[in-house]
């Protein structure tokens, strides 16, 4: 089971792919309603599965993974950051010495981050998305401004 949502820019379509043994897939297919996926969503998935589109998506995913690792290392080196959790997604969980000031600095730069401070054991934690290079630069700038 694999999502097409985030990595393939189809978040609104709510699509995924399921691969498996034909016998298992047959059992699952029997449980599906007659038209389980809207036609526009199917068209988007079919367009995505074209070789050229898959190649572009793979390049973008690789670039995002590289930016994520670089961003994690950069943030972890800043004095205002206590911890950056390992991530397999397109976001990072970052524990800050002053999360409120970091959030304000991000807002001033047109960036939204999610405050996780109210969650148990996550005091001072923000979830930051790995954006495009310009967004990533503004994010680092916001963290550095608070440090």
Protein language model regions, located:
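Short acidic/glycine-enriched loop/turn segments that link adjacent beta-strands
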Residues: 12, 88-89, 120-124
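Hydrophobic residues at beta-strand termini and immediately following loops
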Residues: 1, 84, 128
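Short hydrophobic/aromatic beta-strand micro-patches
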Residues: 19, 93-95, 129-131
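Short secondary-structure capping/turn micro-motifs that flank functional sites
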Residues: 44, 66, 91, 122-123
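Residue-level detector of anion-binding/catalytic polar loops
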Residues: 112
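PLP-dependent aminotransferase class I/II
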Residues: 1-77
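PLP-dependent enzyme catalytic core of the Aspartate aminotransferase-like
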Residues: 105-109, 118-147
């Amino acid at each position: 089971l694999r999502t097409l949502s985030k990595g393939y820019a189809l978040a609104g379509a709510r699509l995924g792919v399921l691969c498996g043994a034909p016998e298992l897939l047959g059992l699952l297919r029997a449980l599906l309603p007659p038209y389980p996926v809207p036609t526009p969503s199917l068209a988007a998935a079919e367009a995505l599965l074209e070789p050229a589109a898959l190649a572009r998506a793979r390049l973008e995913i690789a670039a995002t993974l590289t930016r994520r690792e670089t961003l994690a290392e950069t943030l972890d080196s800043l004095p205002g950051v206590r911890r950056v959790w390992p991530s397999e997604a397109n976001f990072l969980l970052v524990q800050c010495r002053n999360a409120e000031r970091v959030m304000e600095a991000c807002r001033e730069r047109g960036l939204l981050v999610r405050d996780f401070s109210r969650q148990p054991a996550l005091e001072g934690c923000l979830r930051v998305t790995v954006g495009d290079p310009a967004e990533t630069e503004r994010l680092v700038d916001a963290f550095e401004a608070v440090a």
